[in-house]
Amino acid sequence: MSSDNMIDLEGYDCMAWYDEAVFYHIYPLGLTGAPKTNDYGEPVHRLNTLLPWVKHIKETGFNALYIGPLFESVGHGYETTDYKKLDSRLGTNEDLKAFVKECHEQGIRVIFDGVFNHTGRDFFAFKDLQKNREQSPYKDWYCNVNFGGNNEYNDGFSYENWGGYNLLVKLNQHNPAVRDYICDVIRFWVSEFDVDGIRLDAADVLDFEYMKALRRTANEVKPEFWLMGEVIHGDYSRWVNEGTLYSVTNYQLHKALYSGHNDHNYFEIAHTVKRLYEMGGNRPEGLKLYNFVDNHDVERIYTKLQNKAHFTPVHVLLYTLPGVPSVYYGSEFGIEGKKERYSDDSIRPALNLADYANAAEENPCTKLIAALGRIRQHTKELSYGDYKELMLQNRQYAFSRSLDGKSVIVMVNND
């Protein structure tokens, strides 16, 4: 990579923090080694064990953190019991406030996981529905409640769920009371925890008018409050626009980055980038997608790569292609994690930071990630620059990121 002299940033004062964000991603129930099932007992202050990670996050070149799910649930975190209470396996609301405060003091923005498509069965509205049935004031809070049906829990009624799992009860997003409640949750998270944004879980099945209501609330609660959505397939511009979300997860590039290296096929990567760039109107500010090579739902990149040396070009591309880069906790150390059929434990492990005390000096993966983070944060072309493909072959790929007449040239190979 090469760059001309530093550019004049006078014209970029209006840019938001997320335009230059480099994200670190934590799944806290996994990283802290929390029990798989919540007994709703006394809080255990596991979140406090993540405070030393804040310094590590900063020193490894990150200036933003996506952490979640965080709030009270019975199991993996996505079956919410209470949106306004930190999961008791992680601690108390005071612990979460202190954690966000420490991140902010280190110059790290924080976004939470917002699980607003569905609730768990222990959520107050569903408990009332179980108790009062047709007389419940919350009977219209959920989709397709049928009091003539039943389910494996023998509720005496059936309902729409997410993903075929009745543990995850789909909210009726057309109901104004539901919208008002969730918007109030967003306001609470800002006033209580000073959060900087939200990643919307299952955004690809959220109602668009519902998301627009969330966006209006986001615009009101805090300057530069960022809404990013989990979307797998489709035309991302349906979600990323002025009235809906600021960004979505870039699963299309995620797939191309690892398979393009395993198959020695940079055409797959370059054509994916071109297609995504065109979705945004051929301008970098059009779609600033949330780029990643692994996360809490997919296999670790170091496991997916057939040639482990490709860890380097994969991450060079992650940090230099249009979009917002993100690294999943532990992957900066090059750890492995295979996706298993009935368990995500191997991709959501507990880690002890002390075991990686010398990684910054001795671990080549960590050194690479830290160097790329520094480059990204000090090279504005990578955040704001136009993209232009310069050379493309099966095993070689070059492109430029240009801004105000100055360019960064990126060249990678997969030999």
Where are these regions (language model features)?
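Aromatic- and acidic-residue-enriched segments that line the glycan-binding/catalytic groove
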Residues: 41-43, 76-88, 116-156, 216, ...
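N-terminal structural segment of carbohydrate-active enzymes
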Residues: 2-112, 117-119, 124-128, 164, ...
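Loop/helix patches that line or flank the sugar-binding groove of alpha-linked glycan CAZymes
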Residues: 2-4, 16-20, 42, 271-275, ...
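Conserved, mostly hydrophobic/aromatic
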Residues: 26, 57, 67, 83, ...
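The substrate-binding groove and active-site-proximal loops of carbohydrate-active enzymes
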Residues: 29-47, 79-93, 164-179, 196-205, ...
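Active-site-proximal helices and loops of the catalytic beta/alpha 8
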Residues: 2-6, 100, 104, 130, ...
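Core domains of carbohydrate- and sulfate-ester-processing enzymes
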Residues: 102, 106, 124-168, 255-279
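Hydrophobic faces of well-ordered beta-strands that scaffold small-molecule active sites
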Residues: 22-25, 65-67, 110-112, 198, ...
